[in-house]
Amino acid sequence: METTLQIYTVKQICEGFTYSETDNKGLYGLAGTLTIQPEYQRNYLYSENNGKNEVAVIDSVIKKYPLGLLYFNKTKDGRLEVLDGQQRITSLGRYCTGKFSYMLNDRPCKIFSLPEDKRKLIEETKLLAYICEGEESEIKEWFKIINIGGVKINPQEELNAVYSGPFVSAARHEFSNKDDSRVQKWGAYITGSANRQDFLQEALKWVSNGNIEDYMQEHRWDTNINELKNHFNDVINWIESIFDEVYPQMKGLKWGELYD
């Protein structure tokens, strides 16, 4: 794998920044040439806990603290994908497009209401990025290594990275949207959160009889998730057909095994 060091400003990185409220993820930066959350990346987490972490990113920039290195993968067609730094870049992009406020002198300020010197400070802050080029296996292995720090990748997030493709993309769209109205119902029976892939992991566990990795490997290039979705819904509907009420003790039971 080959790497080259590149310097960008926050303004350059955030040019053309696009954020999907539906999928809770940053889509593009660098005027559309940078894919911020490719298939193998985890969901955006810094907006959780009232946005504590994304505010901390802006605070670091204002205080001129280093944000750390970024790593981009250069694909065969010359486009860039974020390998490491997705949470930081999305936080910067969300702030620079007015998605949240930063407290300055006890006053909430969005980017357009900051004093001009502070706004320029943010826009002109330099970010160091390594551009990586290599085979898919090299890129995926490097992704796992550089993501050891920070918010630890859980086993399902790692499998999503290893077996990224149309199947994982469709499965994440179905089971990993924390704003989906069905999440509350699922959460009565499943422990964890949609954002950290816990519901997807459980759905895969149920349909594969616990052989999640084998199932993901077999279906990696499938363009639909009908079997996965239908089996999950069958289990949920079965639970609801048996119990008239939802009890706290029902959360986290091995429903897939009980159904089978």
Task: Name every feature range the model reports, one short phrase each.
Residues 1-80, 91, 97-100, 127-128:
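N-terminal leader or domain-start segments enriched in small/polar residues
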Residues 64-81, 86-138, 159:
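A short, basic-hydrophobic beta/loop patch
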